[in-house]
Amino acid sequence: MSAAVLEQPVLGSRRLSNFLVASAVTIGGVGFLLASLSSYLGRDLVPIGHPAALVFVPQGLVMGLYSLAAALLATYLWYVIAVNVGGGSNRFDKDAGVVTISRRGFRKPVLVEIPLKDVKAVKVEVRDGFNARRRVALRIQGRRDMPLTRVGEPLPLAQLEKDGAELARFLGVNLEGL
């Protein structure tokens, strides 16, 4: 790439936390299914406890419904991880005079192109508390701020400042919010 192009990858849903949650839901769902089947068949299919001693109606049946709910949730989580929803890139091309923000969606990619002349500033937003928000956004003339950072776990403050300053320097615009 030339010095007139800056490309930033954006992490999507392929994060360790999502893998751990999807794995836990899958294992829990299989456990509930085995407990439900154990109560129906009258044989212990799970090495822990004695689920065969459970009465199938209502306890075994409810565990079967829990396993169905877990299977649906796990399918959704593994699909989101496989597609890498939210992943993509931010591409700033001075030669073409355009900012291209691309993300992977559920069904189709999301592509936003903004002329560089419409970018007024780079905004660094820091809000601490229960619902913390740390993000870098583009302040665009005539539009709402366009977020550039990943969704989920907040970035460290030093990394946020570094990314914002680097982008503002590259684009030749002001850095706001610090």
Swiss-Prot record:
The chain crosses the membrane at residues 19-39, 61-81. It is a multi-pass membrane protein. GO terms for cellular component: photosystem I; plasma membrane-derived thylakoid membrane. It is found in: Cellular thylakoid membrane. NCBIfam families: PRK02542.1 (NF002712). HAMAP family: Ycf4. Seems to be required for the assembly of the photosystem I complex. Belongs to the Ycf4 family. This is Photosystem I assembly protein Ycf4. The gene is ycf4.
